[in-house]
């Protein structure tokens, strides 16, 4: 098969794709103000909520996301209204402290890592994030080159910032006339969230789950040596999609910082889940069972504050991360 020259371009035809691009992320935090300062004031997302849920909705939410019966909580949504395919962030605000999924901001620590934002130019966003009090993880914007498949280089400008609960926010701009790695607002030049990443200890195991259960495809697998320590970075996409990609990062055992041991899912704080639209929840849950994945919540109907009326289920990825699948139901 002749591969596209741009590694971000689709390989397989997406007309029969079982699963769409990453559509939602679940973030659990007690610090809504700081999260809002980062995502809304810094990156331009719109905040909706807190929402009032009736008893039946709360029952469904507790089952779907694993929220204990004795834990009170509120829900908000952060979204980029003018970019319909941007990831919608469900924010769960518990009424008491829950464990943090990550111990530190360290890149090498195993666990859910970041949401990523594509943009045409990074400098203005970088200045704003610094003014808002967020620490850039490097002394300056990181400027480096990647290669197209024919070997030609193209420039990348990237910066990551420490936000809440030991997670990061990544801003990235592709140069050389290439499209960004997700849709951007034509007026602001900023898009996303459009991708998300996990630091994992077994990339092949995680890749098998996302390709065999969710029908994703691998687009890139690189050894990144422009950072120290070096790491392997694999990108997975929905068939036919140019946004909503997953990044899996693996360090050599000697370079890893171990996981906190806190399960990477609600009600624990941090980046706690991903949400994917599917053609059939039943088909995907059957595939999950076939490949030995644990079903966290069986399919049920409920009103999701991001996606409306859905049939949804949740499945455990091999690392224990919460994966939500949903199909929209006509009103």
Where in this protein do the model-derived segments appear?
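Loop/turn-rich, solvent-exposed surfaces of beta-rich toroidal or solenoidal domains
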Residues: 262, 270-273
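Short consensus segments that form the blades of beta-propeller domains
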Residues: 16, 66-68, 103-107, 185-187, ...
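Vicinal oxygen chelate
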Residues: 1-18, 27, 50-51, 85-91, ...
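Flexible internal linker/loop segments at domain or repeat junctions
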Residues: 235, 240-266
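A short, acidic/glycine-rich surface segment
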Residues: 9-11, 57-62, 97-102, 146-148, ...
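Long low-complexity, intrinsically disordered regions
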Residues: 32, 280-281
């Amino acid at each position: 098969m002749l591969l596209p020259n741009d590694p971000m371009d689709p390989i397989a035809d997406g007309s029969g794709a079982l699963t769409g691009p990453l559509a939602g992320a679940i973030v659990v935090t007690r610090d809504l103000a700081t999260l809002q300062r980062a995502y809304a004031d810094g990156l331009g997302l719109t905040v909706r909520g807190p929402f009032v849920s009736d008893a039946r909705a709360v029952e469904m939410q507790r089952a779907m996301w694993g929220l204990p019966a004795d834990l009170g909580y509120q829900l908000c949504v952060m979204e980029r209204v003018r970019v319909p395919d941007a990831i919608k962030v469900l924010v769960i605000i518990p009424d008491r402290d829950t464990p943090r999924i990550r111990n530190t901001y360290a890149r090498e620590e195993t666990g859910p890592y970041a949401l990523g934002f594509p943009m045409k130019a990074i400098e203005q966003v970088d200045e704003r994030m610094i003014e808002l009090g967020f620490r850039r993880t490097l002394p300056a914007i990181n400027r480096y080159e990647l290669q197209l498949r024919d070997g030609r280089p193209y420039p990348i400008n990237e910066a990551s910032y420490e936000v809440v609960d030991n997670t990061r926010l990544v801003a990235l701009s592709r140069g050389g006339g290439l499209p960004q790695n997700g849709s951007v607002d034509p007026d602001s030049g900023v898009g996303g969230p459009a991708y998300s990443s996990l630091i994992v200890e077994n990339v092949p195991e995680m890749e098998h789950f996302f390709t065999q259960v969710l029908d994703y495809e691998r687009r890139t697998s690189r050894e990144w040596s422009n950072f120290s320590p070096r790491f392997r970075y694999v990108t997975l996409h929905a068939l036919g999609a140019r946004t909503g990609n997953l990044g899996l990062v693996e360090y050599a055992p000697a370079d890893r910082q171990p996981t906190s041991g806190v399960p990477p899912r609600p009600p624990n704080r941090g980046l706690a889940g991903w949400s994917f639209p599917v053609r059939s929840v039943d088909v995907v849950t059957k595939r999950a069972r076939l490949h030995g994945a644990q079903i966290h919540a069986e399919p049920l109907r409920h009103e999701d504050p991001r996606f409306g009326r859905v049939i949804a289920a949740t499945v455990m990825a091999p690392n224990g991360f919460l994966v939500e699948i949903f199909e929209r139901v006509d009103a």
